[in-house]
Amino acid sequence: MRTDSWIDNPCPIARTMSVLGQRWAVLIIREALLGRSRFSEFKERLGIASDVLSTRLSELVDAGILQVVDYQEPGDRTRSRYLLTEAGHDLIPVLAAIGQWGHRHLAREHSSAYRFVEADTGESVAIGFRRRNGSKVPTDAVSLVAPGA
């Protein structure tokens, strides 16, 4: 399903889904968070068709999530790397929340070892809500409020 028409939606969730809702987009971002940056790395790790990967990378660049940086190995032609932008790095808590939900609600016997950890300690981290003063808010105490409510 194409979600291009959502880009003009007043809802920020719908606008975000116009980018992240495209098949492969979130997995490409996950791979970029793991340090992959070359077309061949994305293709190999994801098993995605070249034409689809090319389209998704272009969409993520156009959305400001990835940036293209050219590089050249000695004796080789110029190639492109795809690096996360600030907007791309801002998706870390979004992907962490998706992963946290998946571990909890879609657990499998041989589940993935992907997890988010604190860089300095290696300790697992969890996503949650906090008030402006830093105190925790239970998820069941949080409501989504529509405009004008």
Where are these regions (language model features)?
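N-terminal helix-turn-helix DNA-binding core of bacterial DNA-binding proteins
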Residues: C11-V52
